[in-house]
Structures are given as structure tokens and as C-alpha cells.
């Protein structure tokens, strides 16, 4: 629907809400505004329309429209651009509220809640409507603003009190208007104007901002032309508001949607019509049509309700009307402004006392009891809305009587807490309408609407219902369509669950995962049976089976609503033999439910549980039965760690046994420690000091009263002496006896035992003592043979010998290994079985001669004799052989009276179908879970029971193997480096939640090098082997572990191999397996090589998290585009000198950016072109000869985790990229597999030469900048700005990703100091910088780059726009820059041309900086300004801050909490409105930086919106805001804090006023003692004003008490290193350093970390601890205690003391006023002489600084021939050497550290050799290219 430019408001008359929305969606914003203006103009004409009291101005309309237009989601808003009228007793900001009394009028400071909700939904408020004064009346004639007539007759009343609202809707001026309804005012006008009148359940609409009539009864009501519009507004306004409305209440969840088809409707027996004859006809017809809907219409005596109605005006509820305006009446308002009838009614309240009030309330409660009984069997009441259609004259003649009669059927509704809906009943023969009211119990609003729709279909068939005055038009069927409450079947699927998904049962989480909504508990029809299927995992499964009715029962189930888009995800979690089908409910409805395959019901072990009536009852029976079982042990100690300890604890918890964990120092925070009921430290690091120390373990058991010790696997699990020691200590060892372990532990004796048990043996020998004997035996056995240590294990002490020439060497080696590792030099020989398989049988023995085999496992896939992947049942194994294996194992166990779990291992010769005894593991195996998966047993539980002599009856136990299970072992090891262990901190961990994963690791786990590298066992269960392989593959694809290198890629490679698919496995197959990793390997790291992505980490600048990303985004994006990647794909940034990289897979690369010699396998390759790389090739990127950075794009990208939405590396924060750091020698980076690679977008392509960036060969650059945010004349003198652009700036040596420092002319300041912001004219209150801002830190400019700080207190003269920032990424120290001014428009044009050119690869689209783009002169950065209105609405200055930022600055240069709150209001408004184009709002002390998307909103458009928003912000000084009070421990002047100061003194500046001690400096300049500084720190409460004051959520906070705001200064120059957690004071501000970072605050102590990088703490949803308006307090702790707290924080177990609170500004001001004398005295003491002395001190210090720069002179020196000269790749300060003269070092080893600005950079040795010279000492300045060391290369 569109309109032409000359269309008037007449075309919109009678439009519904949807008509208005359709118009706006199909029209331009100009057309939309014109139509709204036309509507407004049409109402601003003579004669005055009595329906309106006030209309908005054109300016107000434009303001509302501007705000609406700014909203990103405006077209989805339910009231998008819909004009709405509001009754004039409801507050609308911008219009007076009169309540129809001119002398009562006031200007509301904010909207009422309902108006706020309507505006939020997109509505445009056009005016306020007339009413009976103070909403007292049902006639619409009691107003000094005139009488509002009925829309159909000027002689008849419109009804009151909401007369005006009904009139403007009936005439179609607006589709919706708000009324209020205390006693019928929302219904009577609806009846008299042919409208819908919705009077909601009392309290579900907020009455905040509504002038009360009777506050306890008032409701806001809705007038609408159709049901759909009424329901739409109901849904919008139905929001609880308990903070502002005492009677507010939330709507019920899952409310009644519709009444039944035979709903019982009661009508009055006797209806007084007061002589009216026409309305009874309408009512009778309406009732008849209600009956036709199928309703059961009955007559009842309404007397209890009518009695209740009489209370309203005959009782003390009149007093409520008086209370509402008492203060107004006491002010003696002009009598002519008061309606005499209204005032006489209200003043009638004076006759009632407080006693009367209680009397009438008691009376009401008594009547309500009658009402409840009356309505017990009634669903709905139907009454005439009003009996009369009075004329104006009739009302004038009998004003009270007529009004009273009109309220006959309305007055009782709110008193009885009922919902009501007034609907039309048609027209009388005189053309006047009337209606009926449907009344339901509270919260039946939706059902009443649906009933009305049914009624309309009967009384107005075939769409014949008219609306309002539009009697020639009918309501479109769509406009009476209803949505109903939020549960919508069209977007969800009903699902019945019957088993473990029920509430409180183990799989209920799966429903929660898919956002299912509980609907009800019900039963099936009587046609079902319920079965418990055999348990083959930890969860019991049900089987619901439909049968003949005669054999079936009703089964209890729960019904849920599952969103359609997540239903597939839910189905994927359903294991076989279950599936999803349909079930018939007892109501006859068929819905989705679980079904079971026939095999499930027939499987052995299936139990018919129908008699229990439901799964829950059966489950409870099992629990009860379980609890009655024999108590096993009270306490069991787990003598192990890692995943097996975690797994054992689960079973102990299930059995109700108290668990005890033991732990080493590195395992202090491990999962088994936190999972156990009790944890005991073993005090040590190595295995020998802890888990292998028998005495410590047994002492821990005694200490905790453990009756048993279960050892798991490894460590002491097969130590016979430990088993004996436990027994001697009176503690049960959960395992076999020491004698059995000893006998089976030595391989030669194990062979003898096996032989005795009749178990086949591999041909072999007894123990051999000499080489000669070994040679003889080997010859007899025939080569190849295995030489084995009798005590070996874990792959140690066994080696294959192929020929006699090797036997001597290997014999001695194995003998030595046995003696070294196991204390036993015994060796024997066995024949080697070629292509043997490793098959083992899981054995359980009861200790009394009975043993049972629980199945076999194939564990043939091994690397370095360690198992990798196991499966059960063993594939390709004849059934006869399988049974023989099990029988042999049982025979061995019975012979030994074996007790508990053991594994009998066999070598299986598949070719000959023969098996031989290998050994017995006298413990639980790592791979035991796969046996559990196919048998449904809990092997640990069996072990515990057997150890307690409560073994199952093996004779009657029938073990059934169901399906196939596989396990893959996830190790922290590097498969590319011969499976070298790979310890590290895990930064991200994800496992599939549908598979079984036995693990001990999670995000934040530190993998120690001390122990086994096992991270997890990933276990799946399938119906057959193919299914299991498929599931294991899926599980491995979904497994993500970052922070250390794992074997996940290796595992995926194996299970997708052809040999694994065919089960062609053997113990040696992996030895020859050609693993082809999808990875690259760093063999030389380069100077500063990191992973970045574009656009980086967006949206966290306000927190102090920089975007990072590429310094040269243009070249970076080209690299990805050339190889065909999506622009967001991570790639590699190279700085100064590039890396060498080995590619272990084929791929395509491109190198862009600066020029360097690039070679592939020694052959030079071109840049800016796609290059194919073969597997095994080595790429080398040399030193950059032009530019500073190059970029390596790899097709498909690099597999690294996202951090805060980005792959980019931020090294200072140690986040993102590869483990949060630059790449190092030996790093292995995996590339995404093809299955998961979503980064590839198109084929690789060459790019035209014209797209290659023009990197300066002359070291001279021209860079465009936008002016501002700070300029002339307020900050800089005009000539200083001119000089900035006319002079050339040299790039300082101290430049990097944190910032590019410049050397050039000293600025000429327009002011002498920064006022409250600081002593230097460059200082200002902390605000958030723009990325690319040229920031004057004192007199020295620094360009803020992608890793730079966000919040700071220095002015910025210009900003490098986004399109020009790539040049900043390419400048090198010593280069010169000429800045030129650009307009916003030119900057955007350059940026947009780059985007188009890169996307299209069309060089003609690219615009470069040229004379046309450049402004002739600099421009003012001030874009707009709003003058001060009052103290709470200060001056606002909008400053240009680049091409994507606007800085909004409030008030004068002073810190003011009211300004901070105003900024918060603006941020909240933007967030609420989802304002188009705004990316982020970053709060400073008195400003907010707004980042915007130039593609969505222009700078000018944004300014209009921001100016409009300012007028929306209204508050007084009594504001409140949510505020956490955060209490932190702090160690005063701890050693680490003092070390930072010392390091600064040694390396940066040897003398300064704040040296050698910062606390002394603060005390001296403030004339106080050190103790007073100490007292201030621990007594002050600091208010957080902004975040990111030196990165990562570091707060900029100010003491609430002005007496705690000391004089002070920051370091100059700043520190390059500050300890994480350091607390600093800088003048009035306090900061906590969130990371090891640069800084300038005076350091006073240290607290716990405030940046939870991995969100490990239970309360951490985000990494940052604080938000603006939080309050911080410190309490003293020792340094030792703080270190422990810090360690706890780093491991997520420290709980920060946080108190949820509200900051009450009014209370704060009261406190300030109460202490004003001492505050004033303190502030005056800081002025005058002290301030002058302080300023002079700092001035002198700065002067001294300029004279103290030290650069070590060059020295001429000859070095030996062949010496390797090491040059610095960086400019900076020499911090320290990490190797010494005389050391022999390897290539790549670190030599020394250069510190520059915000980073430490290691210079490594280019070659191996001996260091003969280190050329600098600590603190020396070093330039890029300087010689820093000399190495003598060794032959």
C-alpha cells in the first residue's frame, strides 16, 4: 500500500493496525511522515473536536518519528508507525496531563508505563483525549473541555469516562486508544460507539503514570476496531511492573486459550432496562447467537454481584477517589475548573471513617464468598454493557441517576477481580449501537477474545460485522484473527515423554537443551504397555508399545512443546532402539512421542513395567530397592587421578559411598579433587612424590576413615606390596591380593600359571640370564622373536628382534629397562606373531573360585605399544574362537581364586585363527567403558561389591552383549613429533554431549608434564560396527580441545581409513601407517608472527578489549580473497621478518602486504597471487624490504578457537589466536578439515595489479585523517593545527601493534592545563579513544592502533579513518608521514571503494587518496551542540572522532555523577531501541564514544537521532541504579608491586618525584603520612565510571567520598610493565590492572585478578568483573594470602565478595550535605599553595626528563671471520639478556629481550654457536637494525 505526496489523512480513516504497518513498510519514510503529519493537521482544524484535550506538535511528531526511524528492527515492531490516542489521565511525556481539570494540569517528566511499552512497540502518540473529570463517570459529559458526543449522534453521549478515546477510534482517526476502567469506563463507551472494549484482568497492565480514580481497582483499557488489534495491544502492555505499581502482577504462564465448545455462559435472570425497549432486542439476539456457538447459556441471580457493585459508590471506595486528589483539592483550585457532579461525588468520601473502611472491606469479602459459590459452575458471564443510550439532555436532567444506571452491569467487575470484554451487539432501528460484555475469571482474557470471535461469526455471518462509524465497510476476517498466548503450536511440536526425560530424571536436560516448554502431565489412551529395556549404558530406557485396547493400560507421561527448529537436534539424541512416532492421549489427541523397535521389546532382559502405570513409579521402586541393598563401604579412597578418578567417583556417588580423592600439587584444582566428598593433598609434584607413595596414600585413608582403597589403573594399581600394605593396615584393597598380583605381574610366572590353567601360550622360554642362551633360544623359536622384561608394562621392556645380529644389543637393552623401570632384570623370549591382533577378555572374579568373562575387546591399534582405539566385540572373530577366549580367561581366574576386575590379554593370529596368552592386567583397564556400553554393567560397582564380599551370583548372571562400542583415547601429544607430550593450559574444550566422554579436563585445566597425557576417552555405542564408526567419527569431529596439541586429527585419520573400516587391524599396523596431518608446522617463527582475523574482536572496546586483527586490514583481506576464503577467515600476520613453515598437507596460499623474499622449497614465489603448496613443502618469508607487515592467507584458514567472537591474537591479554601468543618454533597449527570448513567461499583467483597496495619505497607516506575529536580553538591554537598538517612526522622507534609513536613539532596549546583532567593541557577526564586516533600523550602524539588502549585521559587531534589505517600498519621506524585532512564523506567513499574492489576484484572500483579527496583546510570537529537546559540536562557537544565514531561530550570539564547517569540513560535508550547502525557505546567519565556502521547510518543521520534521544532522557537528582558492591582483598605494597617500580627505575627513568616509592610520593604531595594513604585505600569506596583504563575491564573509578580524592600525577613516561592485579592511584582516580601491561598510575598494592579470561568462576558469564556504577572496596590481606587467592582465581574457585545493591543518588547527596563542612575544608586544602607546589614539581620533573634520554654510542669493533652478527628487528629499550657470553646456544634460542612501548620482544639466535658478545646493557636504547649480539658459529 502506498500513497502519493498529496494524499491526505482521509485515506487512513478506519485503518487497522496492520493497514498502518503495511503502509509504512511499502512507503518511503518521507511518505510515512507526510501521512502522519496530514493526520495531525486534520485534527488541528476548527471547530475544536471535543474528543481531544491536546494534540502533539509537529516538532513532537518529527521527534517521535526520528526515534522510530533510528530503530534497526522497526519493521518488525508490532505497532510500527501506528498512531495512537491516550486518555488524558495517563501520562505522555511532551503533553500535559489534565485529568479534564485545567487547574490540575502538570507536565509529566516521563511516559506512563503503558505508553512507554506502546512507544517501544513502535507507536506514535498523537494526542490526549477527553474524559469525565478525574475519570469519575460513565457519561462523557463531565469535562470543562466540552462534552464528547456519540460518534453516531451529536445528541447522544459517547459514554464515559473514556469518551474521547472511544470517539477517535470509532471515527477511525486512530486504530487504538487507551482508556481507563474502574467501573466500566473502558466498556460503556465501546458499546455506544460500536467498538471492542478490552478491560483486562486487574493488575496485568501497569497503572504507573495514571492519575488514580480508585487505585486498588483501576485498569488501563483498550479501545479497538477489531479483536486482532485489541489482542495485539494486550500482548504488548501485559507486563508486570511491581517496582512502580503496587497492584501490578504478572500474567500466568500457559493461560487458558479458549473455552470449551460447550462453555457455560450465565446471563442475568432479571434485567432492569429502565424503560428502554430497543436495547433488550439487541441483547436477546446476542444471547441467541451465543447459544448458536454451542454454548450452554443459563440464567442466574446476579444479586450477589449487584450487591458488590453498590459498594463502589455507597462505600468507602469513594475515599480512594478523594485520596487521589486530596492535595490538589487542599490547594483551593478555581471552582470553575471543577465539575460540580464529580466534586460532589468525591467529597462524599469525607463522611467515612477508617472504621468504615474496614467495615466495607469485610462486607466485600463476605459478598465475594457468595460470588465464588455463584460462579463455581460458570465459565463466562454475559451482560448488557449498558442498559441505555442516553441523550445529552437526559444526562443533564438526571446526571447521577443516568450514570448510576449505566453502571449496573459494570461496577462489580473489578471489585470481583474479573476480566471483561465489551463487544458490539449490532444496531438498533434508530441507528445507534449497543453491545454486550463477556466477563470471565481473572486471566481468561485470551479465552474471552476467542469466545468473542466465535460469537461474531454467528451474529455477523459471512464477514458482515462493521466497525466504528464505518457501517458501509466490514471487518476483514484477518483483523479478527487471534494469536493467543505465547505458546504457538505453529512454531513448535508437542512431544510426550515417558521415560528418563521426565522431570527430575537423568535425560530431562535434553528437553531443556532444546528449549522445550512443559505443558501438562497426562496419560495415554488405554491401549499401551510400558517396558524397561535392557540397560546398556548409564541410563535406563523405556519402550512404549501400542496394543489392543483389551490388553492395554493408561501410561502416565509428560507433554512438552519443542520448537520446530530444535526438534531435529532432540531426535539426534535419541538412541536406538528408540525413535519418534506418535501416541494417543486419553483426550484422543495424537501427538509425537517415543516409540521402540520391535527388537527392543523382544530383547533379553526387557521387563514389562505396565503395572506401575508409568516410568517414574518404576524408577522410584528401583531407587528404593537400591537403597535397601547391603551397605558396602562408608568411605572409599581413590588412589589415582585424572579421568579414572572422576569416573570412579561417579559410581561411588551412585552407591551412596563417601569418596576421598588424593592429589598432587599440580592437581590441586583438578576435577577429581572438586568432585570428591573429601580431598587430601599429597604434597609433592612428581608421581614418585605423590601417587606412587604408598605411605602417603595409606595415611590419607586412615586420616579420612576410608575402609577401602580403589587404585584405578597405572600408579599403584598393580603393585603387590601396596595391596599387602592396605591389607596390613586393615583397609580393603579393591583388587586382587598381593600374591596374585605378584604372580601375574612377572611375565615368566604368569606364563606358568596360564599353562597350568590350560591357556594357550606363545612358544617361548623361561627366564634367560645370558646372551648366549638368548641366541640359542631365539634360533629354536625362529626369528622374528620378542625380547620381554618379565616385569615390563606400558610398552616399556619389550622389543622385536628380526635377526641374530641384533639379539645381543636388544637383550641387554631390555634387561637394563626392566632393572631401571621395574627393579627386575628378568628377561624371556617369545615367538613374534606377524600381524598379530591384541584381543583381551574382561574378567571378574569373586575371590572364591568363581570367575566370569564379560566379553572381549580388540585393542590392536597401538602406537608405541600404547592403545589408541579399542572396540567390542572384537571384529572378524569366529564365534567359536570368541567363546574359547572367554572360557580360557574364566579358567585362569577360577584357578587363582581371582578377586575383582582383571583383563586377560591374548595375541590372536587371525590367519591361523589361533590365540595365545599374553599377560594379565590385575586391574581395571582404561578401555573398560566399552564393555559397560554393550553390557549395561557398571564395572566399578562390581569391583566395589566384590571387594565388600557382595559379589553378584555369577552362575545366574547372563551377560548379553548388545551392539558395538568403540573408544578413542584423546592424548595431549604431538603426532607430528613422534607423539611427543604436549602439556599446556586448555583454553577451550568442547565434547559431544550425546556421546559418553570419560574425562577430567575442561576449559582452564592445566595439563602438567608430570603425568600420563590422557585427556579423555570418547566412547560411542552403535547398533553395529558401521553405526559405531559413524558415531565415533561424528564425536571426534565435534570434539574441540585447544591450548595444547592433541592427537584428535590422528584419531580422525585412523577411523576414516580403509583398513579400519574393514577391520584389517594388527598391533603393528600403525607403525607403518602413513599419517597425513592437515597441519602446518612453524620451523622458524619470525620476528612477530601471529594469527589475526578481520574485522577482529568487535563490540568490546567499551570493556578495554581492543579489536586486534590485522594492522593492514586491506592487505589481509586481499590475502583471503586471493585464496578464495570468506573475509572473516583467520590468517597469519608477519612483522619485519617472516617465518619458515612446513606444510604437511596440500593447500593454496597467498602472501600480500609488504615486500619480502618468499620461497617455496628454495624457489622464489610471487606475492599477491595464489600459490599451490604440496605436502611436505617449506615456505620461507624473508625480511621485509618495503613495508612493515606481510600477510599469509591459507585456503580454508587455520583451526583456532574464537575468543569473544574473534580468532585474532591479542598478545598482551594472552587471548585469541594460537594460545594467545605469537607463533613459536615448533608450533603445529591444524587446518580445518574439509567436513567442517565453512571458510572457503570461492575458487582462488589472481588479482589485478591495480589492487595491490602502494607501499612507499621512499619511506615517505601521505595519510588522510579526519579532524577531531579535539581541535581549535578549545584545545589547540589554530597555528598548531596548521603545523600538524604542514609538517612531516617521523615514526618513532617505539612503535608496534599497540600504537605508532610520532616525532614532530611540539603542539601549541590553547589552554594552560587540563583542569580537573590533569596538570598538562593535553589532559582531560578519561574518555574512550577512537581506533586510529592521534593521541597526544603530553606533547608526543601516538596513533592508537588495533591492540591499543581504549580508555585514557589525553586529547586526540585527528583520527586516521578506516580506509587509511592500512598505511599505519605498514610504516616503519624512521619513516615520515604527511597528514592531510579528509571529510567524513571522503573517508567513507575511500572505505566503500575498498570493500567493493576487494569483493569484486575490480581495480577500477578502487579509489585512492588524491587531491580531490583532501580538504583545502582543517575543519572543526564539532558536528553539533545542544545548550545547557539545567543542571541535569547539561550542554552536549557532538564531536567527530573519525569516520566511524562520534564522541558525545557532556557538561563542563568536571566529574559529575549526574552526567555519568545521563550517559547510562543514553546507552540504555540505544540498547532498548536497537538503534540502526550503532555498533557500540563506550562510556567515559563525562562522555560516550559511539561507534556506528556507515553502511547502515550516516554521520548526519546518526546526529539527528542522538539529538532526538537527548530530549527523551528525563530524570531528577533522586535517581537510582543497580550497583554491585565488590569487596576485594589487597596486599599493600607487596613485593611484586614494588618490583614494577624498581624495574621502571632501572630501565625507564632513574629519578622522578614518584621514585623510589609511589606511596611516599602521594603522601608528600598531599601533606599527609603514609599511614593516611593506607587508611584511605582501605576505607574508601570507589565508583566505577568506565572500563578499559589500561585494557581488559580495568576500571577507572573515583572515591565516593570527595575527601579521598588526592592530588597526584601519573608516570611520565609510563611504565612498560605493571603486574596483573596492581592497584594504582592517579590523582582522584583508582585503577586495577587487569593484565601485565603498561601503565602510569602510582602503584600502592595488589589485588586478585579482575579479568577471568576463560570465565572459569561459577558466577562468571563474561570475563570482566565490573561494570560502570559498580562500587569497589578493599580489605587488607598479606601477600602470602593474596598469592593463594590469586591462584584460586586463576582456577575458578575463588568467590569474589559481591553484594547486589542499588546506588541511591538522593541518599548520597544527603550524605554529602551532612559532611559538607569537612569536604569543603579538604577541597580548599588542595588548592592554593599546595596545588602550585605540586604543579611546579611536575613541571620541573618533565623538564628534567627531556634532558635525560640515553642512547649508547656505536662502537667500532672487529669480529672473527665467520661470526654471525645478530641485529635487532625492533626499536626499543634493552631490558635484559636471557643468555650470557660464553654460552653455547642453538638456532632459535632466545638471546635477549627488547622492551618497546607495550610489549617485550625476544631476539633469538639465527644460528647455533657460542655467544662472544652481548652489545647492550639494561636500559640502553636500541634501534631497529642495531647489532645486539655476536655469535661464533661452531664447526
From Swiss-Prot:
Role of this protein: Hydrolysis of urea to ammonia and CO(2).
Subunit structure: Monomer.
Note: Present with 952 molecules/cell in log phase SD medium.
Keyword match Oxidoreductase: no
Modified residues (N6-biotinyllysine): 1798
Originating species: Saccharomyces cerevisiae (strain ATCC 204508 / S288c) (Baker's yeast)
Any single GO BP term: allantoin catabolic process
NCBIfam families reported in the protein's UniProt record: allophanate_hyd (TIGR02713), PRK08186.1 (NF006043), urea_amlyse_rel (TIGR00724), urea_carbox (TIGR02712)
Top-rank lineage group of the source organism: Eukaryota
Domain Biotinyl-binding: residue ranges: 1754-1832
Lineage: Eukaryota, Fungi, Dikarya, Ascomycota, Saccharomycotina
Reactions catalysed according to its record: urea + hydrogencarbonate + ATP = urea-1-carboxylate + ADP + phosphate + H(+); urea-1-carboxylate + H2O + 3 H(+) = 2 NH4(+) + 2 CO2
Keywords for the protein's UniProt record, in alphabetical order: ATP-binding, Biotin, Hydrolase, Ligase, Multifunctional enzyme, Nucleotide-binding, Phosphoprotein
Entries under Gene3D superfamilies matching the protein: 1.20.58.1700, 2.40.50.100, 3.30.1360.40, Amidase signature (AS) domain, ATP-grasp fold, B domain, Cyclophilin-like, Gamma-glutamyl cyclotransferase-like
GO molecular function: allophanate hydrolase activity; ATP binding; metal ion binding; urea carboxylase activity
Phosphoserine, modified sites: 803
Name listed for the protein in its UniProt record: Urea amidolyase
PROSITE patterns, per the entry: ATP_GRASP, BC, BIOTIN, BIOTINYL_LIPOYL, CPSASE_1, CPSASE_2
Entry binding sites for ATP: 122-129, 747, 830, 865
KW Ligase (keyword) present: yes
